[in-house]
Amino acid sequence: MIKLMAILFLVFFGITASAQVPRVELRAVWVATVSNIDFPSSPTISSDVQKAEFIKLLNMHQQNGMNAVVVQIRPATDAFYPSPLEPWSQWLTGIQGQPPVPYYDPLQFMITETHKRKMEFHAWMNPYRAVFNINNSSITPTHITKIHPEWFLSYGDKKYFDPGSKEVQKFVTAVVKDVVSRYDVDAIHFDDYFYPYRIAGKEFPDDASFRKYGGGMNKEDWRRSNTDSVIVMLSRVIKQENKNCQFGISPFGVWRNADKDVNGSNTKAGQTNYDDLYADILLWLKKGWIDYVAPQLYWEMGHDKADFNTLIEWWSKNTFGKNCYIGLGIYRAGSNAAWKDKTQLPRQIEKLRNTPNISGMIFFSSKTFEKNPNGWNDSLRLNYFKEPAALPVMR
C-alpha cells in the first residue's frame, strides 16, 4: 500500500511539474566571441576546426533544451562575416582584416547550422566599442578608426565611437542594415554597452561633441537623446529590411534606483542604465522601438543591493507589452558563493516562470555549460527543459 501511494505521489507530481512547463518560452544562451570567451576556442585554429567547434556547441545546447543562440558577430567594430564596412575580427583569425583559411562565411555557416536544429539565431552586435584594448589590439589600416579618427574617443584602455556624432549614428545603422539585408538572422541583439560604464575619477571625453550638437540641453539629457536617436534609426532600418527580424536589447539589470526615481527599483546599484549608460530602456519599450528586452539579472536571490526577486518583479511590471527575457548569470557558478548553491539556478527559473510577463531566459554564457556546473545541464535536460517549448512571437 505504501509503495502504491509512493508511485501515485510520483506520478501525480511528475504530471504536475510537466504541466507547469511553459509551452512558449525562449531558452537561449549567449555565445561571446570577444577575447574568445566562448567561440572559437582560439583565433589560430583552422576554419574546419571552427566549424566543428560550433557544431559541437550547438549540439550541446540543443541537447540541454535550448531553442536559440545569441552569437556575438561584431565584438569591436569588426566582423565574423565578410563586411564591406568593417574588417574580419582578430578573434576569428588572429589578425584583424585577415579572412579565415580555408575561406568561408562564418555567419552564414552558423545561421544555417542553427536553423537546421530549429533554433533561432540572434546576431549580437556591440554598437559603440571600437577598439577593445588600445594597448594590444590588432588594428588594420582599413579599420574605421584609421579612416575617421575624428569619430572616436578614448576612455580607459578602450576606444569608442562618439555617440553624439551624427556620422557615427549613420555608420552604425549602415552596419546593421548590411547584416539584416544579407542574412536570415532572427534578431539583432545589443547588450548593455551604450555609453561606457563610468571609470572612477574619469569623465567620458565628449565635450567637443556636446558643444557642437548639444542644442541647449544639459549633458545627461543630450547623451540619452543620442542613444535614443540611434535606437530609432536602427528600429526603422531593421523593419524596412526585414519586418520579421526582431530588435532586442539586453541592458544592465537596473534601469534606475528608487532613490533617484520613484519609478525605479528598490535597489542600490552603483551604476544604472538611465543615469550612467544613458540608455532609457523604458522609453524604448513604451515607444515600441524594440521588440524585446533581456535585462541582465546576474545577482543572486537575497543580494543586498540588487536582489534577483526584487528586480524580476520590477521588470515584469515594466515590459509595456513587449517580450521580456531574463539574463541569468550561470557563469558565476564557479566563483560566487551564492551561485555554488545547487538550488540557486532552479529557484531562479521557477521564479521567472511564476512571474507575469516574463517569456523566457538567456544564459551567460556558453562555455560554462561545458563544465556542467552543479549538474545544471542535467537539471535542464531532464527536468526544466525536458519538454520542448515554442519560441515567443514578436509583439
Write out the residue ranges for each language-model feature.
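Polysaccharide-binding and catalytic clefts of secreted carbohydrate-active enzymes
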Residues: 66-67, 117, 146-289, 298
